[in-house]
Regions:
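Ubiquitin-like/PB1-type beta-grasp interaction modules and other compact soluble beta-rich domains
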Residues: 1-107
Length: 107
């Protein structure tokens, strides 16, 4: 079977737990793209740093880690499951729903 040259995924970035906005997009990405590529392609500004495990996203849309408590920061899930690998290591196959949210807010 011919390998598709592109995949389509949906992504939502949700900062509502910290009073920020939420945005969603449907993206067409090259085959072999990662969750990191999807974030980079969705048009939301973000900051990330390279670590020994891969790219670590520390800020999205101006909302940074640890702004709302020492454990607060961005997490992602794919099809409702939280992955324990860096977003730059999670290769997408197409059809996934990616959800980024700002977690562990201390009120």
């Amino acid at each position: 079977s011919q390998q598709s040259a592109s995949i389509t995924v949906s992504i939502t970035v949700d900062g509502s737990s910290a009073g920020a906005g939420s945005s969603s997009a449907t993206l067409t990405l090259p085959a072999g793209a990662t969750v990191y590529d999807a974030l980079a392609g969705c048009g939301v500004s973000f900051n990330a740093k390279a670590t020994g495990y891969g790219m670590y996203v520390n800020s999205i849309a101006g909302l940074a880690e640890k702004e709302h408590g020492g454990m607060s920061g961005w997490m992602y899930s794919v099809n409702g499951s939280v992955a324990n690998i860096a977003c730059s290591s999670y290769v997408l196959s197409g059809g996934e729903y990616i959800y980024w949210w700002y977690a562990n807010v201390e009120y």
